[in-house]
Amino acid sequence: MSSAKMIGRAVASCRLSSKGLRSQSVDLSILLSRNTYPNTRTMASKAITMDNINPNIVKLEYAVRGPLVTRAGEIEKELQKGADKPFKKVIKANIGDAHAMGQQPITFIRQVLSCVANPEIIEKGNFPDDVKQRAKDILKACGGGSVGAYTVSYGIEMIRRHVAEYIQKRDGFPSDWNNVVLVGGASNGIKNCLQLLVNKINGKSSAVMIPIPQYPLYSASLAEYGLELVGYYLDEERQWGLSTEELERSYAGGQEKNNVRAIVVINPGNPTGQVLTRENIESIVKFAHAHNLFIFADEVYQDNVYAEGSKFFSFKKVMMEMGEPYNKMELASFMSVSKGYMGECGLRGGWMELVNLDPQVQANLFKAISAMLCPSSLGQSAVDCVAKPPAPGEPSYDLWIKEKTQVLDSLNKRAKMIAETFNQMEGFKCNIVQGAMYAFPQITLPPKAIEAAKKAGKAPDVFYAFQLLENTGICIVPGTGFGQKPGTYHFRTTILPQPALLQEMLDIFRTFHEKFTKQYS
């Protein structure tokens, strides 16, 4: 096969499906078969082989887009070809992609994006005056008046200033726009900061404390950079809260072989859906101060708080209100347009605020960021709409607040629905979804199912998830991909399917679980 044909087939497998969703799977058999290489060179003569590839890339795993998702994509293609299955569609409850699950875009954001992408329509289109002005302001800040131009590597200054104003209004403490960096999604900002820690000290590797269960971005990034992961367990019996005792246990164990240098906190939680109390945050801050740890505050779900009595507190706000010495601690906080009420995952927009970094360290971080050129201008434009939304009295305000409220109210109802339904099912235990976009139920599996999983070479929760997918078309993420206490089994499901589809999914889930339990009893 010619190289052109091989590349063509690989690209074809990634084209948009009839539903407009990009498949996550590439036909690897094309690339791995020894009979399809474009020349007669043997494997031994390849410049890059599995013997000399970066071992950190081999170790890297990302469960949210792992084998189950690949299989789900294959099943979708099989259904499109008329395959006979006991279901007609795949329900992707595995990933926090709101728009893919039917959430409608926020009008103000999309109108501004339309105008900056095609300036000719600003005056020709029937847009509100505040949309027109915002688009003009963004374009004025772009080189050549076009979002097609590179921006400053750290983001457009005007938008960084708006983010700083947003943070200051949220927390009640000053925010310097020079410490705000616009990023291509919060994930990029997190990875940029993690790179600062890649250094052996006195012969010991650097390590980062990560909550267990955790969002797989962290374990994947630590593996990629050769950093060590030190897990601290969240307490499922206490609504996925945490204790100082557990933090100290984790730190002491990690410090024996490594240099523990940072702690990651995800609030509201992914995959666990908890919202930390102010007391919890204060305890973490005091712990981090006692051990001189850098804090990664992953706060991308700060708008997603549902449970009565729950409230989001930013780490920066709590640190500042605690006063000295805590208000001098080093912190990086992260926000994204992918979550919240916006759900603009594909635009890849977000920001990070750097607090109390050593000026020389921050200069070197900015140097590293410069090598990546700049985040997407459209993503930055979406950030501007989030950081500075329409104000009361402006033409777009009434529709904006209506749409925002509808999205968050609907998510609130779905959060309650999913927890209540799982708790009514035998063998399930699900904590209240206080915030974020996920439930993380614990499931009791029959001993025979656990034995069948072992024979199949799979973890029990992975075995269960594959059975669920093959029999119902529902795609979830096994708890194994996030980490869990030994002897317990969980899975993560999003609350993002629209209400009717979510109810359908839960009904199918109930029927499947009853059959599964009966089969392996």
Where are these regions (language model features)?
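N-terminal mitochondrial targeting presequence
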Residues: 1-48
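PLP-dependent enzyme catalytic core of the Aspartate aminotransferase-like
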Residues: 2-10, 24, 119-120, 124, ...
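Conserved core segment of the aminotransferase class I/II
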Residues: 6, 46-50, 130-137, 224, ...
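N-terminal "arm"/small-domain region of PLP-dependent enzymes with the aminotransferase-like
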Residues: 32, 40-154, 165, 169, ...
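Generic structural signal for small/hydrophobic residues in well-ordered secondary structure
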Residues: 68, 93, 163, 180, ...
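Short beta-strand
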Residues: 83-84, 90-92, 429-434, 521
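Conserved PLP-binding catalytic core of the aspartate aminotransferase-like
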Residues: 100-102, 107, 401-412, 416-471, ...
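Conserved core of the PLP fold type I
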Residues: 115-292, 296, 302-325, 332-333, ...
